[in-house]
Amino acid sequence: NSLIGPDFYWTAHPLDFLDDNDRARINVFDWQKEFSEIMEAGGFDTVIGNPPYIRIQVMQEWTPESVEYLKQKYRTAQSGNYDIYVVFVERGLSLLNKGGQLGFILPHKFFNAQYGEPLRRLIAKGKHLTEVVHFGHQQVFAGASTYTCLMFLDRTARDTFRFAKVDDLDQWRRVGTGDESEMPVTRVNSAEWAFSAGKGGTLLEKLGRITPKLEDVTDRIFQGLKTSADKIYIVEEKERRKDCVRIFSPEKQAEYWLEPDLLHPLVKGGDSKPYSLTRTNRLILFPYAKQTD
């Protein structure tokens, strides 16, 4: 196990308390001993791999001692429900020499998942990101539903990184091209990664500069609009005049005239289309007045 070193036995798990089966299952690996010349020279020039994709819950059932060790040893193992591949990235980085490079194929779920935040922070802080080749929904491995990317990291800090989006896997395999963009490394942070290439990348970056953002207005949104009585509060506009609106009430199956200040346009999820909203005559009754202190 390349993630677990001999210090596993020196701390909470002395050899005397583990039988042969336990030792074989945990299978510690001593990088300093097995690659002594390389490690004494500063580390590896290159680390290349396809780390395992295993949820920590599975490892907890199989080898809980290892899970506890990882939590104490690695920053990327601090989140509760992480996937083991994020720890392999941290370990791979630590094995590089000052000019070393890492290249992994791995799921891109950590770009947005909560458990990926420690790894995103680690990469952002060191400005390690060199290149991402994002396969989106394309299935690279036959017979396995995994959504992957190629990620390349440098041990030394970078000023820019390259992002490529692959929409046609067969074409990419033949000619190695896709939509590409060169981006400043300042785009990499511990928040969710939302990189985009080509014309879409320019638009996304422009939208990112627009303020205020929703996160600036509120910390969290736990639930959308809820009336608890839609048939009463959601009505249909029939006619509008300057000082009154004629509405139809589904609850009463009747029409009424109401003051415009009590009614507001209501948009539901199904009304939103790319770059536009479907016009509806749906209104919501809001019989309250907002007052300031």
Model-derived regions: residue spans:
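C-terminal substrate-recognition regions of SAM-dependent nucleic acid methyltransferases
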Residues: 42, 95-97, 114, 139, ...
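SAM-dependent methyltransferase catalytic region
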Residues: 1-133, 137, 150-177
